[in-house]
């Protein structure tokens, strides 16, 4: 029997209709896996050994009562076959410390999804720089004058922090906007933090597409997140409307070009953000949108993921 651990935000607070981690747990349980639940505070290192206080978990598709704990134990993480790192951002120093603990278990043979080193290496905004032929025009800087020059060149730009999620602190600055200076100062904290500028993509009106990639293989359907009521952000957390769709030809092209790199880096479950035919983000920490896509199309994304995990476990 496969022992699967999951590190996540409190399961009592999730919305099971939309929660991708919950969908993964349902599929793992359906396959007869033993589920071990952990929050960040349950992980610890003792004399170099990664351990955790885990609670054995049962889950069910029931909006009143979706989980129950059936046991608890303190164990070496190396006792688990696979651990899903599903803690939501912020990607802060605490998150980084947790990846080091998980890496100690990985060295003993536990499969970590996604690979701890790659979680540290691949910032969701900056990692797109390795695929700059696929992205919008992009500037990463702390320098206000450079931001101003970029804005003057493109006249309609998007500014965002490198560590936000859910559309937080994303600004659109159009031609003649008197607020560029204050936005630049706010995002860079007066030149002490990097931010990202990209030329505005009018295709956002048709949606910001979340394309999921499972161990290098694109899922054939995506979720387009369409901005509502004059918003420039499609993120569901910012009020965008989700619309599942088949991948377009350019979606396939982008996902297939990036897929082999993701696989090689042990990034087994990844969400690409695509606007029109441009890649804007590579989400590696805790990608979502499984449930919305599975509800609309005959595809089991969680099945693809567990198949990929089982294949990797057999290779070890």
Swiss-Prot record:
ATP binds at residues 151-207. Its EC number is 6.3.2.3. Mg(2+) binds at residues 281, 283. It comes from the Bacteria. PROSITE patterns: ATP_GRASP. Its cofactor is Mg(2+); Mn(2+). It holds the Pfam family GSH-S_ATP. Changing residue 240 to V: Loss of activity. Belongs to the prokaryotic GSH synthase family. PANTHER family: GLUTATHIONE SYNTHETASE, RIBOSOMAL PROTEIN S6 MODIFICATION PROTEIN. This is Glutathione synthetase. It comes from Escherichia coli (strain K12).
């Amino acid at each position: 029997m496969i022992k699967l651990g999951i590190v996540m935000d409190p399961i009592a607070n999730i919305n099971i209709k939309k929660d991708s981690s919950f969908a993964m747990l349902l599929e793992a349980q359906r396959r007869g896996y033993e589920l071990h639940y952990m929050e960040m505070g349950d992980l610890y290192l003792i004399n170099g050994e990664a351990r955790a206080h885990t609670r054995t978990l049962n889950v069910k598709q029931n909006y009143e009562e979706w989980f129950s704990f059936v046991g608890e134990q303190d164990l070496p993480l190396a006792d688990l076959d696979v651990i899903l790192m599903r803690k939501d951002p912020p990607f802060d120093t605490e998150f980084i410390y947790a990846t080091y603990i998980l890496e100690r278990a990985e060295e003993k043979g536990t499969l970590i999804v996604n690979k701890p080193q790659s979680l540290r290496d691949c910032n969701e905004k900056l990692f797109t720089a390795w695929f700059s032929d696929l992205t919008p025009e992009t500037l990463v800087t702390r320098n206000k004058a450079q931001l101003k020059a970029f804005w003057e060149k493109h006249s309609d730009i998007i500014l965002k922090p490198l560590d936000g999620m859910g559309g937080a602190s994303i600004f659109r600055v159009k031609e003649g906007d008197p607020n560029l200076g204050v936005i630049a100062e706010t995002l860079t904290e007066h030149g002490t933090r990097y931010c990202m500028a990209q030329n505005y993509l009018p295709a956002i009106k048709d949606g910001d597409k979340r394309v999921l990639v499972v161990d290098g293989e694109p899922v054939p359907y995506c979720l387009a997140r369409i901005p509502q009521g004059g918003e420039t952000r499609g993120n569901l957390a910012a009020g965008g409307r989700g619309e599942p769709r088949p991948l377009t030809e350019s979606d396939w092209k982008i996902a297939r070009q990036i897929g082999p790199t993701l696989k090689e880096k042990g990034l087994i479950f990844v969400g690409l953000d695509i606007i029109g035919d441009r890649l804007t983000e590579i989400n590696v920490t805790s990608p979502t949108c499984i449930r919305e896509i599975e509800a609309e199309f005959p595809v089991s994304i969680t099945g693809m993921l567990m198949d990929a995990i089982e294949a990797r476990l057999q290779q070890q």
